[in-house]
UniProtKB/Swiss-Prot annotation:
Biased composition (Low complexity): 45-54
Descriptive protein name: Uncharacterized protein 021L
Record's compositionally biased regions (Acidic residues): 55-71
Region spans: Disordered: 42-71
Length: 219
């Protein structure tokens, strides 16, 4: 009987030129790819913060607008009352605390413009009267018979209404309004000048009566 001898198989060793891949090589490759192709980060989107209940915001805005309208309505109503006190002979439209604010504002603007024009026309008429009286005095001093010239001009003041209205409208917004104290002193000085000129011209009562009739008819 033959004996069987087991001989272990010896595989032929093979040598490769390629270097085995290590963990460090994988890390280097990952870093190179990251540098070549950087990852673009998205910018965070800003989401506007809105009220969770928009109806509450709308209600607050409506309340603010309503309060502003009520305040303006009260202010305009008071100004209408002041105009009625200042101009008792003028026709002032009736307004209440429940009137429309836009209508009150527009009517008040037109009304104050008309009253301002009338006031400026009367002021210019006083300047004309003073000027005519001075002209009569100067002409009389120069031995010219100019008696009655000022009275004639006072009686015909209506002829200047159209020109004075155009002049008052021209300087309505262009001329800045002076202080109340200055306007008061100017009015007092003008009335004093008219009085003294009427006295110098003689017939004081007749002269002042003509002035009253002239301004009474123009207003």
């Amino acid at each position: 009987m033959e004996t069987i001898v087991l001989v272990p198989r010896q595989d032929q060793e093979t040598f490769s030129d390629s270097r085995p891949v290590l963990d460090g090589d994988l890390m280097l490759e990952f870093l190179e790819n990251k540098i070549r192709h950087p990852v673009r980060r998205r910018q965070p989107r800003v989401v506007p913060v809105t009220s969770s209940d928009p109806e509450v915001v709308d209600d607050e805005d409506d309340e603010d607008q309503s309060d502003d309208s009520d305040e303006e309505r009260q202010r305009l109503y008071f100004q209408y009352m002041v105009l009625k006190r200042m101009y008792p002979t003028e026709v002032i439209p009736e307004m209440t605390t429940y009137s429309n604010v836009a209508i009150m504002r527009e009517k008040y603007k037109l009304l104050t413009r008309r009253l301002s024009l009338d006031k400026h026309i009367n002021e210019w008429k006083k300047y004309i009267i003073v000027g005519m009286c001075i002209m009569e005095l100067v002409m009389t001093k120069l031995n010219f018979d100019a008696s009655g010239f000022a009275r004639y001009q006072i009686k015909s003041l209506g002829a200047y209404d159209q020109l004075l209205a155009e002049m008052a409208d021209k300087y309505y917004e262009a001329t800045p309004q002076s202080s109340v104290e200055m306007r008061l002193m100017t009015t007092m000085g003008m009335n004093m000048a008219v009085f003294m000129l009427g006295k110098l011209l003689g017939g004081q009562m007749d002269f002042l009566g003509l002035l009253e009739n002239a301004f009474g008819s123009s207003s």
